Amino acid sequence: MNGLFLFCVATTAALAYGSDAPCTNSGGVCQDDHLACHNGHYQSGLCTGGAHRRCCLTSASHTGSFSTGIVSQQCLQCICNVESGCKAIGCHFDVNSDSCGYFQIKEGYWHDCGSPGSSWRSCANDLACASKCVQAYMSRYIGFSGCSHSCESYARIHNGGPAGCKHTNTLGYWSHVHAQGCSHNSK
C-alpha cells in the first residue's frame, strides 16, 4: 500500500511539473519563487507547474564580458548577435543536434575548444566561458586550409567548421554577421 501511495505522489509530481528542460538547458533551476535566487534572477515561462514555480538563472550565466584572444571583441559581438541576440537562449535542435547558448555551440565544438567550464550546456550559457570556447576554437583552426585572420574567416569557421571559410555555403552566414556592423577586417 505504501508503494502505491509513493507511486501516486511521484506520478502527480511529474504531471504537475512536467519537463524543466527549458530552464535546465539555460543553466537554471526550477523552484518556487518565494525561495531566494542567489546571485541571479527569476525568469517566467521556462518551468512547468504552478504560477510561482519559475526558473532561477544565476547572473554568471547572463552577464560578463567576452574572453580575449585572436577574435576581436567587435567580431565576437557580431557573431553573438547573429546567433542569439547575444542572450543565453538555452539549447535548440539545429542541423541534427542541439546548439546552445550565446554562440549556439554544439557539443562537438565544445570538445574541440578544450571543454571549458563544468559542462557543455552551462559553458554555452555563460558569456565568458562561451566566448573563451570560441577563442580557443578559432586559435585551433584558423590556420586550417589557409584561412586568414579576419572576422569573415572567424564567422565562417564558427558556422561551417574548421574549413568553413572555404565553403560557399557559409557566405550567407557572413552576410548576417557583416550586417551587424562587422567588416572583413574587424578581426
Swiss-Prot record:
Substrate binds at K106, E107, G108, Y109, W110, H111, D112, Y137, H158, N159, G160. Pfam families: Destabilase. The keyword Secreted applies. The active site is at E83 (proton donor), D94 (nucleophile). It comes from the Eukaryota. The keyword Hydrolase applies. GO terms for biological process: defense response to Gram-negative bacterium; killing of cells of another organism. Its EC number is 3.2.1.17. Highest levels of expression detected in the digestive glands. Lower levels in the mantle, labial palps, gills and style-midgut sac, and lowest levels detected in the hemocytes. Not detected in the gonads. Disulfide bonds join C75-C151, C80-C86, C91-C100, C113-C133, C123-C129, C147-C165. One of its GO terms (molecular function) is lysozyme activity. Optimum pH is 7.5-8.5. One of its GO terms (cellular component) is extracellular region. Residues 68-183 form the I-type lysozyme domain. It is found in: Secreted. Keywords: Antibiotic, Antimicrobial, Bacteriolytic enzyme, Disulfide bond, Glycosidase, Hydrolase, Secreted, Signal. Its main location: secreted. InterPro entries: Invert_lysozyme, Lysozyme-like_dom_sf. It catalyses: Hydrolysis of (1->4)-beta-linkages between N-acetylmuramic acid and N-acetyl-D-glucosamine residues in a peptidoglycan and between N-acetyl-D-glucosamine residues in chitodextrins. Has antibacterial activity against the Gram-negative bacterium E.coli. No antibacterial activity detected against the Gram-negative bacterium V.vulnificus. Belongs to the glycosyl hydrolase 22 family. Type-I lysozyme subfamily. PANTHER family: DESTABILASE-RELATED, INVERTEBRATE-TYPE LYSOZYME 2-RELATED. This is Lysozyme 3. The lineage of its organism: Eukaryota, Metazoa, Spiralia, Lophotrochozoa, Mollusca.
